């Protein structure tokens, strides 16, 4: 799926030279011009952060980085590390400009992580393509983010399990 690769190449924080990696590296230093797609995902992330009063906050990057979730070397960080990272988390410290599609993280050390919203955005794009192709039933798994389209078959709904986060993966 080319669309998924396109989105990942723009907004992943686990790849070098993505637009969001550049934004994070420029935190507290300078504005970054974004593509329409990256800007739209960032703006939607800010909107959801506001709607949840920060319970969902796209500037969670420093905290996510501590855990290294999904990467080699994943660990549970210390309380001190967590408390330090929390000081960088505040979506109100993102400035955006709709006319120039520029974004600025006002505090050095801030990091945006659009992984959750980008995966949802990518899933929505895949669903559009599948529906255009006449597919009415599918499970889309984008790194643990699941989209269930339709039902398993005419008699059964999809069953989705949730793994205990403290058990071994398997």
Give the role of each language-model region:
Residues 1-170:
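Mature catalytic core of soluble alpha/beta enzymes
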């Amino acid at each position: 799926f080319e669309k998924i690769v396109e989105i990942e190449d723009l907004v992943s924080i686990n790849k070098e030279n993505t637009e969001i990696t550049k934004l994070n590296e420029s935190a507290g230093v300078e504005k970054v011009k974004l593509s329409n797609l990256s800007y739209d995902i960032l703006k939607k992330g800010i909107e959801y952060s506001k709607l949840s009063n920060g319970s969902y906050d796209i500037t969670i990057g420093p905290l996510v980085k501590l855990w290294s979730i999904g990467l080699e070397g994943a660990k549970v960080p210390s309380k001190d590390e967590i408390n330090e990272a929390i000081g960088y988390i505040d979506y109100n410290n993102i400035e955006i400009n709709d006319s120039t599609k520029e974004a600025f993280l006002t505090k050095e050390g801030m990091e945006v992580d659009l992984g959750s919203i980008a995966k949802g955005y990518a899933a929505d794009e895949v669903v559009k393509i599948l529906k255009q192709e006449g597919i009415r039933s599918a499970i889309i798994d984008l790194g643990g983010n699941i989209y269930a389209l339709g039902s398993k078959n005419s008699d059964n709904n999809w069953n989705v399990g949730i793994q205990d986060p403290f058990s071994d993966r398997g």
